[in-house]
A protein has these predicted regions:
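Divalent-cation
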Residues: 2, 6
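Helix-termination/interfacial motifs at the ends of transmembrane alpha-helices
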Residues: 8, 12-25, 143-146, 150-229
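Large intracellular
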Residues: 20-161, 233-290
Length: 290
């Protein structure tokens, strides 16, 4: 939502200021210049990126306008899920949660949290870690290294579409100059004609440079920055899961393990101690509805 507001503010301020100076909007409407810039930019994306990165880029663009994936409630649900798993494991032994982590779709503990069930990356991260812990043959330090490696790979993958979009954004001013140069070539061919016609062609050429710079610094650049921050938010979320699971695997009590996880939650969405404690005292499905 804020991204949409920001785009409206950017274009509103530019167009508004232009009109205040008695500018003619019709001069800025140059479809040919836009086709040159947008088409060349799309081509560079296709040249430089494999299909799976293009897919992630599209998903990232949709995420910019769809809001955060990790609000306060997502952290509460995740910590409650971990607490339920930790508590049952502490009471009945690690083997008690083996069936849950082997097939979470049949686990009442997991299915009580639909948002987590929809995120297969998070589901695999939790289940793979706890499945390794239930084997009993791996040291806590080694499990923590596995989680760190998993997070590193996932974060690198999340950074790829951001880098791709940033590269496109950086190329737009240059592509705008390409469009402007082509406009100048056309203008040179019209020399000797009416001054009004020459002036119109010069204006059209300058619009190419204008569009390239505007789309770079006013649209795609900020969108790429937003996607990068979303990737950082996701990494912070995985860090919360990691420290909570690592604490429990080392032998920490369930409530203290999720408290360690809570301390790792970023400040703007961090739940309070008492809020998390009350939630953990509730039963699984009841807590999920709270």
């Amino acid at each position: 939502m804020f991204a949409i507001i920001g785009i409206v503010v950017v274009f509103g301020a530019i167009v508004g200021g232009y009109l205040m100076e008695k500018g003619n909007l019709h001069v800025l409407l140059q479809p040919a210049e836009l086709i040159i810039i947008a088409g060349a930019a799309a081509g560079t994306v296709l040249i430089s990126n494999p299909p799976h990165i293009l897919k992630k880029m599209a998903q990232g663009l949709a995420g910019v306008f769809g809001g955060t994936k990790f609000p306060r409630q997502r952290y509460l649900d995740s910590l409650k899920l971990l607490f339920d798993l930790f508590s049952r494991s502490r009471r009945e032994g690690l083997s008690a949660i083996e069936a849950d982590v082997e097939d979470p779709t049949k686990s009442k503990t997991f299915t009580a949290f639909p948002a987590i069930m929809k995120d297969h990356h998070v589901l695999n991260f939790i289940c793979d870690t706890l499945r390794t812990a239930t084997s009993g043959a791996v040291e806590p330090f080694d499990i923590d290294q596995m989680m760190e490696l998993d997070m590193e790979v996932h974060h690198q993958e999340a950074a790829q579409p951001v880098a791709a979009l940033s590269t496109v954004a950086d190329s737009l001013p240059g592509l705008g100059i390409v469009a402007a140069v082509l406009g100048v070539v056309i203008t040179m061919g019209a020399l000797g004609g009416p001054p009004e016609e020459i002036g119109h062609k010069v204006a059209a050429a300058l619009v190419g440079t204008f569009l390239g710079i505007l789309l770079c610094y006013g649209l795609l650049g900020p969108i790429a920055s937003n996607m990068a921050k979303s990737a950082d938010e996701e990494n912070a979320y995985y860090h919360v899961l990691r420290v909570a699971m690592n604490a429990f695997i080392k032998g920490t009590a369930p409530i203290l393990a999720v408290e360690i996880g809570r301390r790792a939650v970023p400040g703007p969405v961090r739940p309070g101690f008492q809020e998390l404690e009350r939630l953990c005292r509730k039963k699984g499905p009841e807590a999920a509805a709270a």
